[in-house]
Design a protein with these regions (language model features):
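Interdomain/boundary linker segments immediately adjacent to catalytic/signaling cores
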Residues: 2-36, 217-224
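Non-catalytic C-terminal interaction segments of nucleic acid-processing enzymes
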Residues: 50-51, 130-224
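Short, well-ordered turn and helix-capping elements at secondary-structure junctions
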Residues: 64, 88-91
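Catalytic cores of nucleic-acid endonucleases
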Residues: 91-135
Length: 224
């Protein structure tokens, strides 16, 4: 099958996560309107992520709710880490981004802002956030990785626990031998028991495993 990036202009490194290497330009489909909107950028980003992670056991989820739906991740990538991509198309503003950034920063291992370069320059994203510029090459949209994402230096255990559905959280507690006394309790009580009983790295791994098991996940290993 032809790659969506057969028309890409490549630098020496194909891996955008490799630091200190020139970023590649990934050219995608034509925009659906005179001015690119969210669906155009989202489609290009998905093509890029599918091409990057195909065959690696990675799964992709759109509109992943964080902190019980306070914020939704435009595109989440689940593998050995949980990465979140926030999209701002040329027709968007950054008005909501400070709150989105705050919530993302409680949960994800790596975060990316995908936006036109002018918006990236104005953003309040922390230094550990990665930045991907959206721009036009002729009549097509393209992406360039300007700054690789670093590991989130400070995640909030309770916000991570809230990614688990009630039955998923109880399963983790049963595995840790700590479910007794909370089986019929509220999610708030269950989440509290989780963060008291399970190490953060183990909790993160349990969340990733749960997300991979959910039926709405898109299995990138099976796409081609």
């Amino acid at each position: 099958m032809t790659s969506p990036f057969d028309s890409k202009i490549s630098g020496p490194a194909r891996d955008p996560f490799a630091q200190g290497r020139p970023a590649s330009i990934f050219i995608g489909r034509k925009a659906s309107a005179r001015r690119a909107v969210d669906p155009d950028v989202r489609a290009l980003l998905r093509e890029y992520l599918e091409d990057l992670h195909n065959g690696t056991g990675t799964r992709l989820l759109e509109e992943l709710g964080l902190c019980q739906g306070d914020v939704r991740v435009d595109v989440a990538v689940v593998n050995g880490e949980l990465s979140g991509y926030e999209i701002k198309s040329p027709s968007d503003t950054l008005a909501r981004f400070p709150n989105q950034c705050r919530i993302y920063s409680k949960v994800v291992d790596r975060a990316w802002l995908v936006a036109p370069e002018k918006a990236l320059e104005k953003s309040v994203a922390p230094e550990w956030w990665g930045m991907i510029a959206v721009f036009e090459v002729g009549d097509r949209l393209a992406l360039r990785v300007l700054r690789p994402a670093q590991l989130n230096p400070k995640r909030d255990p309770i916000s991570i626990a809230k990614l688990l559905w009630r039955d998923e959280a109880l399963e983790v507690l049963r595995g840790a031998g700590r479910a007794r006394g909370v089986m019929t309790k509220s999610r708030k009580v269950i989440w509290k028991r989780l963060i008291e009983s399970v190490a953060l790295d183990d909790l993160r791994a349990a969340v990733r495993a749960a997300l991979k098991r959910r039926p709405e996940m898109i299995d990138l290993c099976q796409r081609r």
